[in-house]
Amino acid sequence: MRLASVPDWVSGVVPEWLAKVMRPKKAAPPWGTMARAVLALWVPMAVAFATGRRELALLTAMGGLLSVTIDSGGPYWQRVERIATAAVLGGAPGLLIGTLIYGRGWIAVSAVVFVAGVSSVLARLGGVGSVTGLQLFIYSTLGLGPLGALRPWWHTALGFLVGVAWALLLITPGYLLSPRSAERKAVAEVYYALATGLRLTGTPGMAGARTALAGALNAAYDAVLTRQASAGGRSARNMHLMAVLNVSHQFAEAAAALRATGETVPPLVTEEIDLFGDAILNERGPTAGALGFGERRGGGGRGGSGEPQLPLIPPVWSTSPGALALRESMVNLTRVLSGKWAPAITPPAAEPPSLRSRMRDSALRVTEQLIGGRIVWEFTLRLMICTGVAAIMSEVLPLQRSYWLVLTVGIILKPDYGSVFARAVQRGIGTVIGAVLGAVILALVPYGPWLLLPFGVLAALLPYAKARNFGLVTVFLTPLVVLLIDLLDVAGWHLAEARLVDTVLASAVVLLVGYAPWPSAWQAHLPGQFAGTLRAVCAYMEQALVAMPAARIAATGSARSPKRAPGEAPGLRSRLRRRAYRSLSNLRAEFQRTMAEPAAVSRRATAWWPAVVALEEVMDAVTATVVAIGRGTTVPSASSVHALTRTLKAVADAIETSTPPQVAGPLPGDPALEAVTAAVRSVLSVLTRDALAVSQGDAPA
């Protein structure tokens, strides 16, 4: 199944930024999720028509719809936490608030503005807090409509939670059949991403592969750590999977060294790394026997019959530091997969902090997140103003479904869902198409059980659309909601017409009240994020090129890397490297988000692109130098490294204070730092060229 992408001719008809907004991402259909979506929504609808209790079935379907729209996959317990928290602390209280303010006029207007502010504050607590805040707002607003009139009031929340429980029940069989499949898949994806990145070395796709690897590592650590936390202990299988994941840091360092030198690896090597991923995915673990040092074990490979092939270690194909480090990583991973490893002996755990201490630390952390900064509070103000304008319009204008106007404003302005402008455009276009589709369905399909057929199709397409484009989500979500609401108030195609009018008005409110008057909304936010990434790179440089070699020399008399134990947990250097690459990945994501803005904003963002690329080259050069030092090359002087980091930190300070960056004196000429110095020089040449652009808060020209 493929949803059509925006044709190439669109770019010649509409502005480039608009073509980017409309173009869907590539994604494979998630068949399992699509099937669960049908069952989660279709079964309550079938019960509604069979029993005549339309209101209870609607609430159950609403609970299922929440689960479908916020389920982003991953480990079972992570999904349960996300869905249950959003339902119990967001959706259900929201419905109760809606029933309390239903029909109360200006009191309801004030209440929904307050809820919008609370929703924005909750979004600062991270992923689960973000979706919980959004559901609180959505279901409070839905309570202003027909849902708020349902009595008794507790039926509303109870029916909704039953739908959530039904949706959670649908994802449970997969967990019971294979409890660790999500974690194994996440770790396997890291090795698939490594193989893809090595294939793309020296090509334009190399940067995207680096970003994909950073994302895969983040997802894998989240999955494995969540599994360990839910298991309540360090089981042997969990520790083994963590050891497999830890080896990926050795692969990542070797890959960065190869990227920095532009050295490619033979296809056989990347094929074997793919086979490592297959071995992890199929749990070819300690009982599988020794994996092949030059011989195959197992039956056909991927796509063949029998057991999957197990990887072998190819002979040395190059004597470069990067190639040797990559082969050593393959040897270590083979030992971990074959069971020839032992968990590192950890010192006795210190006495755990008291409950009072833990509660105090948690309270401080949450308080810091909630306080935020100026931009965060400005956004909360924008959301509350737009919600207030929409709520006032819903009171004074003769709208058939006035609560939809408020609801759409909140969804478009969701603080951490990307470009507000792009979402307004996508929402508008998607709702036009979706409203027409809903009108056609209501006009052609007779009311009754026959509606189950289009309802099931729309429910199946919703998860697929979610993976591709926000506008596509609205194409299928709009008629879906129209059909659900029509269960309570049979209005036919006029319901779709009202939905269209409300969405157009909401998009206008967002663009005219919540976007155009606020300079921070249409300015590129790349400078501050770039400065933060510069500091993360400097922290990695100082640890990897100064502190780590010094510690090795003090301990062994040599800066050479000691032989790593297979599955050894990553040290501070690896954690700082991962943090820096994650920051670079987030910087790229912010750049892509800004490119979806109109030309006045995206043009300023484009000017930052050479600096982003140059900073990625600095990271690769540092990692390549680290690998070379570990193989016995000369250690750079600490003073030279500190000179480079001082220069980069001064540039970060200049960017944050909107002043032209100044380079004090020449860069160090240490031969051991030649590649790093050249990469830093590239960053400086981009940032200091027409430095007034930086002082004006836009971008390097």
Predicted features and spans:
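Cytosolic/matrix-facing juxtamembrane and C-terminal tails of multi-pass cellular membrane proteins
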Residues: 479-485, 503-508, 524-554, 565-579, ...
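Alpha-helical transmembrane segments and their membrane-interface boundaries
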Residues: 1-136, 140-170, 302, 317-475, ...
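Hydrophobic core segments of alpha-helical transmembrane domains
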Residues: 72, 116-119, 161-201, 506-519, ...
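C-terminal functional regions that serve as terminal interaction/effector modules
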Residues: 472-483, 491, 691, 695
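Long, hydrophobic alpha-helical segments that serve as membrane-spanning/inserting helices
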Residues: 1-38, 42, 50, 71-74, ...
